[in-house]
Every structure is written in structure tokens, then in C-alpha cells.
Amino acid sequence: QRADFDKLLADQAALQGVDIRYGESVIAADVDAGKPLLTIEREDGSRYQVDADFMLDASGYGRVLPRLLDLEAPSNFPVRQAVFTHVEDRIDCAHFDRNKILVTTHPTQRDIWFWSIPFSNGRTSVGVVAAAEHFAGRSENLDDCLRSFIDETPSLQRVLANAVWDTPARTLSGYSANVKTLHGPGFALLGNAAEFLDPVFSSGVTIAMRSASMAAAVLHRQLQGETVDWQTEFAEPLKRGVDTFRCYVEGWYAGTFQDVIYHPESKPHIRRMISSILAGYAWDETNPFVSEPKRRLRMLSDICATEPA
């Protein structure tokens, strides 16, 4: 499903005039020669070079420039692991909405959560995310491992009771990533190529789109001959929104944000402001939960903890 979506996006970009070259890999990058220079390797082993006035790295989890230019830095997040698959879901629960993503929290270990993303063809992407230590003692068979987590979570088990598990599960570990810098001479990093926080709330999509929009605006001015400052006009404002997301991701795993989300007497206007952030408006400084995320979330969590549920 994701491959079909990615190909659709790529085809639409090609229709707009973008030159997309499949089956080729960037194996070297030189940004010290005035103009960025890339060395490309084709599937048959032949190589060629491409130079440019500027490079934008949108390679996502491939993180091409961070790897080639030694820009990778350790993430501050604990090492977490995801195990996931696609199933023929056969969901017949009356309350299940196929137009929405279902996020489920483990009933006793709140830092374990599941996603269920229904597709239009009767299939669903199902996955679990947990800290590495929660996998200790579980089956090394990924299908059995995933289903053991689901079996411990009755609400999700009911949703997937009729599922046909016909696709081998896969795993991804230590996916959170960071970099030493978001830009350098002749290049800037976009989206997950720069920093990936966590799959919860799908912040990666928002950060990818926002970083691309911001970088394109700065680069356009630079190519027009203006003097620009990539640090103050791109890196710092981008980081403010990323740090807002970081606050809510950290709060999710700590349980404080879950206290807010799951509180039965939540105020509609507060839900709207928080939902706005998760929908992508993490740079809207008029929203108090953006301008002061840590203080506001802590205050709200304290209120939820003292009010009767």
C-alpha cells in the first residue's frame, strides 16, 4: 500500500517535470568544491557524477547526506522497536471506523502502543511500538511476537478477532535519528533525512512537508541572488516545531499526555488546540500549547490527575 502511494506521488512529480532516476544510488558527496558534487552508481555498476548549485536531501530514512558527510548524531530518545504487518482484517466491530487510524495503548504498560491503519481494500496495517526491554522473553518469531502483544490488549484483540495473518511481520529497531546540523555549504536536510522522532502522531509527514516548504522558500531567494541565513531562516524555526512535537511524543510515553487524551471530561476548546498540533500546526505560535508546550502540558496533566475520571 505504501509503495503504491509513493509511486503515485513520484509519478505526479514526474508529470510536473521532475527528473526521477530509478535503480540508482548516491555513493559519494563532496560539498567542499564550491558546488556540491554527487557520485551516482547505476544498477549495472557504472558511475557518473552530478553537480548542482544546491542540494536538498529528501531521502527520508535512507539519510543519504547524513551518512556520507558524517552528520549523524545520536537521538535523545530511548531505543524502541516496532513490529508490524498487513492483514486481511475482516473487521466487523460496529464501532470501528475504517476512515480513521486506531491508536491503542497497552492496558497495563502505557509506553506500549499499537497502530491499526485500515485500507480501502479490506486490509489493515497493524503494528506495535515498545521499548527494547519489553521484547525480552517474547518469541523471536515476529508474527508470534506481535500477536502476543495484541493478545494482552483485549480491545484490539476484539477488533482483529477475524483477521487473516497472511503476511510475514517485519521489524524496525532504533529508528529515532538526529543530525549535527540541518544545513551546510550547498545543502540542506529535509524531513526524516534530518531528524526522525517517533511514528506516534505521524509527525514525520508534517515535518517533511514543513521543512520542504521552508527550504524551498529560502533557496528560491538564494538562487535569485539574495543573501540568506539558513540557520535563522530555516534551521531554527524548523526546530521550534520539531521540539513542540518532541514534547508531546515524550509526554505520550511518560503517560502525562495520555492522561490528557483519555480524560473523559476534556474541554472541547483544549482538545481543538491539541488536535491542531497533531494535525500539523506545530508552528502556530498563537496556540498556547505550541508557544509553551512543556509548561502547558504539565499543567494540564496535573489538572487531569486531580480531577475525578
Model-predicted segments: where are they?
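Short secondary-structure transition/capping segments
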Residues: 70-73, 126-135, 202-206, 265-284
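C-terminal helical "tail/cap" subdomain of flavin- and related membrane-associated enzymes
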Residues: 217-309
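Active-site-adjacent segment of FAD-dependent monooxygenases/related oxidoreductases
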Residues: 1-4
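FAD-dependent flavoprotein oxygenase/oxidase catalytic domain
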Residues: 109-110, 122, 128-133, 142, ...
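Predominantly flavin-linked oxidoreductase catalytic cores and closely associated redox partners
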Residues: 11-156, 160
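FAD/FMN-dependent oxidoreductases across multiple families
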Residues: 134-218, 224-235
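Short, function-defining helix-loop hinge/capping sites that tune catalysis or transport
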Residues: 65-68, 200, 206, 248
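Generic detector of well-ordered alpha-helical packing
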Residues: 7, 58-59, 193, 199
